[in-house]
């Protein structure tokens, strides 16, 4: 059986990503990136380096990269839509403009990443992964090894919930506090939190923010082991 590593928000921090991928290679893990791979909000940023590392991990380690809110905004920029280039996106744009990366190829790659991933661990526990929230409205068929959920399987409302998370009139819904009665484990990044419980994993060590407390989170699924890369 294949073993997976769930990797939280990266936000253009090359050194931590490199450490995480070295761990995956040594432990024979398939990385599943939970999104927000670009847009650093600190003084360190290498969006192009992160992109190249991830593309290499796709080839060598069969890595999976999920859609997210930050990537969605970059996609809209690359398609020519008017957006506010803030929260680190301005840095990402500038770094790619000053690189040799083909922007059309970059757009095609970003636009074709799946919104969700479903797989089982060695104990037959199912993991349902999305950047912010795996909608219960998604029907998961029988599958072998891993099932990916792509854009053409979803309507706009569900896509938005998967990359931004559910909201109500009072704001963001903290779904992990109430949504505990299901036979699978929900996995996300996005929330600037680290939560490891029987019913959910939230893996966002605030990588890309300033401070000594921030880290890139990796969860080795079969070992049930959290790794922090500083």
Model-derived features: positions:
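N-terminal active-site segment of His-dependent metallophosphoesterases
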Residues: 1-51
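Active-site neighborhood of divalent metal-dependent phosphoester bond hydrolases
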Residues: 40-128, 151-156
């Amino acid at each position: 059986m294949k073993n997976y590593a769930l990797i939280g928000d990266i936000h253009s921090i090359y050194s931590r990503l490199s450490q995480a991928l070295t761990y995956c290679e040594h432990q024979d893990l398939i990385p599943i990136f939970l999104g927000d791979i670009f847009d650093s909000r600190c003084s360190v940023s290498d969006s192009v380096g992160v992109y190249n590392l991830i593309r290499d991990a796709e080839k060598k380690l069969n890595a999976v990269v999920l859609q997210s809110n930050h990537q969605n905004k970059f996609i809209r920029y690359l398609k020519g839509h008017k957006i506010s280039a803030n929260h680190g996106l301005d840095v990402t744009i500038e770094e790619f403009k000053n690189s040799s990366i083909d922007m059309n190829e970059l757009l095609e790659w970003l636009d074709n990443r799946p919104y969700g991933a479903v797989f089982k661990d060695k104990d037959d526990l199912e993991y349902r992964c999305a950047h912010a929230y795996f909608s219960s409205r998604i029907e998961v068929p029988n599958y072998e090894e891993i099932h990916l959920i792509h854009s053409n399987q979803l309507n706009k409302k569900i896509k938005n919930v998967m990359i931004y998370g559910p909201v109500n009139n009072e704001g963001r819904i903290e779904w992990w506090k109430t949504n505990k009665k299901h036979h699978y484990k929900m996995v996300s990044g996005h929330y600037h939190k680290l939560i490891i419980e029987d019913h959910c994993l939230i893996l966002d060590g605030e990588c890309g923010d300033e401070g000594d407390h921030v880290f890139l989170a990796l969860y080795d699924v079969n070992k049930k082991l959290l790794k922090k890369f500083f």
